[in-house]
Amino acid sequence: MAIKMICSDIDGTLLQYGKKELEDEIFEQIRELHRRGILFCPASGRQYTSLRKLFAPVADCCVFLCENGGVIYKDEQCIAKNPMPRALAEEIANDLWTRSDGQGEVMLSGQNTAYLMERGLGMLKRIQFIGNNYQIIHDPSEVPEEITKVSVYLHEGVESYTERFVPRWKEANCAVAGPYWIDTTFANKGIGVRSICKTLDIALADVMAFGDNYNDVSMLDIVGVPYIMDGAAAPLREKYPNHTPCPEDVLREFLKQN
């Protein structure tokens, strides 16, 4: 096995919650990987605009798995997209909005714009913080393009709503995506990684990946070398034998040994 691509979740993995910028070390590591012919893949629920800004110094060395696999970008071009059936996306959005007890706000993701149904609970500030393109809407039918992901932001945390929404929307890969987010999509990170590997002729066994949450499982389950973060939930730490406090530690050793 020779590693040909390294994928990493962003929020909670490469970028600890609350931070806005990556450490300089990861940029140097990505450049060195690129020199050795190894591709780096940010794999995130974020949109392309946000990810490209975050990785601006090394963006040309990366392939971007955006919207949890809903959209894939390489060389500033969309090379794959997995939209949701329109009627289902609107149904899910309405359900997340009406059944979150007034405590949830809904985001519908297009190819490169986030469409926000907000209640002033903090979602807008978070979207502005990470640098997404966005537009305020009042109904899902107002989204003027294909929808790749529907999410609910729960400002008091997901704990009280996980059982309410995740089983109900299992057909749309409903999963907890962080302390405040639950996502639905017809893609997932595993589908996105498979799409990249097929397009670029990379074997899944030759991929290393890092994640910290349940929406990373589809990716971690299919790659040759999966790593889970030390701060992940106990069931995830038990599922994967390779643990790390941060991807940079693993990449530092990888570059020394290869």
PLM region descriptions:
Residues 37-41, 60-62, 148-150, 205-207, ...:
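Short active-site oxyanion
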Residues 57-60, 68, 167-170, 222-223, ...:
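Short, structured coil segments at secondary-structure junctions
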Residues 99-210, 216-219, 231:
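Conserved acidic, metal-coordinating active-site core of Asp-based
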Residues 1-5, 23, 182-258:
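Mg2+-dependent phosphoryl-transfer enzymes with acidic/Ser/Thr/Gly-rich catalytic loops
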Residues 61-67, 82, 126-128, 174-175, ...:
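Short hydrophobic/aromatic-enriched beta-strand-loop microsegments
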